[in-house]
């Protein structure tokens, strides 16, 4: 009679820890940035509107701001500042890595001027 060798059962691999959704939100909060979803929740809490109504209001406001900027208008946000479109001049730049001089064409950019009331409160 032959003796069967007894092997120890194989160890099961430890299950991989899943990142909790709350941990992801916490990481965004730690970065100092407020996401649109967080802004929607804040508006809903302060106004008593539903999250859906708050999201629609914020989206509509952002669309209006973008539309005004695209048409060349300035947008004043009381207590926050003013968004405006500024022309940028053509200029000579240097390509990183090759140090080659390149011509950067004229264009437009969005500028933001902080309200003095906000500056004083920071």
UniProtKB/Swiss-Prot annotation:
Feature: compositional bias, Low complexity: 11-29
Protein name per UniProt: DNA-binding protein HU
A GO-annotated cellular component: cytosol
Gene (name only): hup
Organism: Deinococcus radiodurans (strain ATCC 13939 / DSM 20539 / JCM 16871 / CCUG 27074 / LMG 4051 / NBRC 15346 / NCIMB 9279 / VKM B-1422 / R1)
Function of the protein: Histone-like DNA-binding protein which is capable of wrapping DNA to stabilize it, and thus to prevent its denaturation under extreme environmental conditions.
Domain of life (superkingdom): Bacteria
Region (Disordered): 1-32
Family from the record: Belongs to the bacterial histone-like protein family.
SMART domains: BHL
Keyword Secreted assigned: no
Biased composition regions of type Basic residues, renumbered to the chain: 1-10
Gene3D superfamilies reported in the protein's UniProt record: IHF-like DNA-binding proteins
Example of a GO biological process term: chromosome condensation
InterPro entries according to UniProt: Hist_DNA-bd, IHF-like_DNA-bd_dom_sf
GO molecular function: DNA binding; structural constituent of chromatin
Keywords: DNA condensation, DNA-binding
UniProt cross-references to Pfam families, sorted A to Z: Bac_DNA_binding
């Amino acid at each position: 009679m032959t003796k069967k060798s007894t092997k120890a059962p194989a160890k099961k691999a430890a299950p991989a820890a899943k990142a909790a959704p709350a941990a992801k939100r916490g990481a965004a909060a730690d970065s100092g940035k407020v996401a649109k979803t967080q802004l929607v929740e804040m508006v809903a809490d302060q106004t008593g509107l539903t999250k859906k109504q708050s999201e629609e209001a914020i989206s509509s406001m952002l669309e209006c701001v973008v539309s005004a900027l695209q048409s060349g208008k300035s947008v004043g946000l009381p207590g926050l500042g003013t968004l405006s479109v500024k022309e940028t001049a053509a200029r000579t730049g240097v390509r990183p890595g090759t140090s080659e001089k390149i011509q950067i064409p004229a264009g437009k950019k969005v500028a933001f001027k902080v309200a003095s009331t906000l500056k004083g409160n920071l």
